Amino acid sequence: MEKKEKKAAVEKKKTAESKSSGITPKDVTVCKATEQMLDKAKRDGVETAFDRAANMKACPIGADSACCKHCSMGPCRLNAKDPYAKVGVCGATIDTIQARNFARMVASGAAAHTDHGMGMLDVFREVVHGKIKDYKIKDTVKLEQVAQSVGIETQDRSVEDIAKDLYEELERTYTQVEGEVPFVSRVPEKTLETWRKLGIVPRGAMREIMEIMHRTHIGVDQHYENITKQCSRTALSDGWGGSMVATEISDILFGTPTPVQADVNMGCLKEDYVNVIVHGHEPNMFESMLASVNDPALIEAAKEAGAKGINLTGMCCSGAEVLSRHGVPHAGNFMSTEAVLITGAVDAMAVDVQCIKQGLASVAKCYNSYLFTTNPRCHIEGAEHIELVEHEPKKCTDEVVVKAIARFKNRTAQVEIPNISNAGIHGFS
């Protein structure tokens, strides 16, 4: 019991320090809506990322990347102020250590985009072979353009045949171990010549990520220039591989965006509607959610619960995508995701992968809002998991909406929505 009391006292002290840190919401954001919600959070006693940043001193060794923990002989701590005074137990210099640390960051970032692109390509394959009925190829012009850019014949051929060939060609982006990724055909000639001269043309995304991780292991690559060279190759496998595949397949499946007028900021939330937010990175979940919120049966259920209807908004990456593609209002970016929950108006937030703070779970709990994870790659402690199965995606998104309606009916949080929305023209592609 004594330990619990001490822990509670420490937490109380931390909260007090946070409130008296002297940093105001105006100091940390230029977004007036976020500023208003951070003020509300202070009144409500709710901690956000901004509070933690203000009260957490950054690790000075980590800031200089002067620590290596890649093997069991360490961790080894070097002095960035006198970088060459000593080396790690294995003899690694600070140049090697910093290059290795940076390389692993590159590998992680490239893996995130590559895995996302590979996931989109998997969905494309299942659609092309008729195994997923909820999605279909919406932009056949884009399909032909992309196919032609990688040398696939399109004249007098069916959409299905072109799509099957395109899938097989783009799959090489990930699985190939020699040669060059397909979209290298788009690289300007002089640029490609330079890449080839430097030996940094990506062979395949998985090959480059695997190799860079191998090189950063103890006893492998121990020259910062050579490690950095592989960083470039891995980064290019992302930009001209995983990311580009994800972009093109998304447009082919769900339609290439065209200019559309839509509102952004938290003013797009509506107090008298069931508010559902989708946040993450993968457009397929959002496309299914669009079908769910427009389902007449679910709209009627929302009205029976006392709402005027269902209001869908997006946040962050996938939110920006459907903002451009469908004109769905966008409530904010990564740093606004906690703030939007503080409005008390969010009945459910459904997330998939990337840019999702673990802190959302505790903020959602404070305002009796639902936070749902939907992807097997991303579970969050404190959030409810409803898995989206690609062959029946609406089953997941329908359940999210049903639970959002139930939360609307039993709202307990005080609602405060910033009266701020900004009109804009989006969808340039």
PLM region descriptions:
Residues 2-429:
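Metallocofactor- and cofactor-centric catalytic cores in central/energy metabolism, strongly enriched
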